[in-house]
């Protein structure tokens, strides 16, 4: 909302009229509203303004989504949304994210806290993801925890490892615990991806859409990938994990190679530049070969699924164009 005025009375009038327009069409209407606007513009959305905006809607006719709780919890800043019902939500992916990301232990602690301190107007847990695919276990955890509140986090991790390998395996259990403690430590953010997705540049990450930030040492994930490859499993989820973690390992290594290439460039060392360039091309080729090992990473599958919505060639091309635009 870019309000013409930011006084509490005017904001309350806006929310009241929005609800009344809904109720005029459906007396049972419930307004579903993201809490993101309060986080995005804290200068204007003071506590007084938030209170006026929320309390001008009849109680229980407004349901708030606390949109990005792994990073900022609005319920804590607004006296639990001043009594209006709300959902605690995990976002996890802003739509352009291809990194292994998610703050597992923090999410666990925050969910436990909202269950105990969130008030009677907490209606449940949700997910506000804008993309999906590469961090499946984080979403499994959030939605499982909404129901299995008596299960310890480490027990849940062990069960996850068992499900993804198809049997109980000590190595798989240990590496998944390490993943949750050492790799899944930072929340996702906009443009979270490796430099393999970026336009070539000697320094930096080219654009906000390609931020290769991680909260772990590259060697940690490399060793976990090596351990995963020693596990015996014929499960599709296991193969997905091998490809997914390996994809991240290769993407991380590309940053190191790019930086070494830049150092050689600054030294005017052409042989070293050619060597690092060859290694970067090899990583890109390896990445292509690896992701071809699982259909979830297939461009062809993505495009075929999009084209299947079309009823003729023109509409099929339309849906394919949209599918290509999304990525």
Regions found by a protein language model. Give the residues of each.
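Catalytic-core regions of glycoside hydrolase
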Residues: 1-180, 185, 189, 197-213, ...
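Short, solvent-exposed, charged loop/turn and helix-capping segments
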Residues: 230-242, 290-305
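Membrane-targeting and insertion segments and their boundary/processing signals
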Residues: 99, 130, 228-235, 247
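Ordered core of a single globular domain
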Residues: 235, 239-242, 246-288
């Amino acid at each position: 909302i870019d309000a013409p005025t930011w006084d509490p009375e005017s904001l309350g009038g806006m929310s009241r009229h929005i609800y009344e327009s809904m109720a005029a069409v459906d007396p049972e209407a419930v307004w579903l509203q993201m809490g993101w606007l309060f986080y995005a513009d804290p200068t204007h959305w003071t506590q007084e303004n938030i209170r006026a905006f929320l309390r001008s809607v009849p109680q229980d006719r407004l349901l708030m989504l606390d949109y990005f709780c792994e990073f900022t919890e609005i319920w804590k800043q607004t006296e639990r949304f001043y009594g209006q019902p709300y959902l605690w939500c995990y976002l996890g992916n802003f739509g352009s994210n291809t990194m292994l990301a998610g703050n597992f232990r923090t999410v666990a602690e925050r969910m436990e806290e909202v269950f105990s301190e969130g008030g009677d107007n907490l209606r449940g847990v949700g997910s506000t993801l804008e993309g999906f695919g590469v961090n499946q276990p984080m979403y499994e955890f959030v939605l499982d925890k909404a129901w299995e509140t008596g299960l310890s986090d480490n027990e849940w991790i062990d069960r996850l490892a068992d499900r993804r390998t198809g049997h109980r395996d000590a190595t798989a259990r240990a590496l998944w615990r390490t993943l949750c403690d050492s790799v899944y430590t930072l929340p996702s953010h906009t443009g979270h991806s490796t430099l393999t997705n970026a336009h070539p540049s000697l320094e930096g990450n080219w654009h906000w859409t390609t931020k290769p930030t991680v909260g772990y040492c590259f060697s940690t994930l490399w060793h976990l990938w090596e351990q995963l490859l020693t596990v015996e499993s014929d499960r599709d989820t296991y193969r997905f994990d091998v490809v997914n973690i390996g994809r991240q390992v290769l993407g991380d290594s590309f940053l190191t190679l790019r930086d070494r290439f830049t150092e050689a460039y600054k030294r005017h060392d052409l042989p070293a530049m050619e060597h690092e360039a060859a290694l970067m091309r090899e990583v890109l080729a390896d990445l292509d070969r690896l992701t071809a090992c699982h259909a979830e990473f297939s461009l062809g599958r993505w495009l075929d699924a999009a084209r299947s919505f079309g009823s003729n060639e023109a509409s099929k091309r339309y849906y394919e164009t949209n599918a290509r635009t999304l990525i």
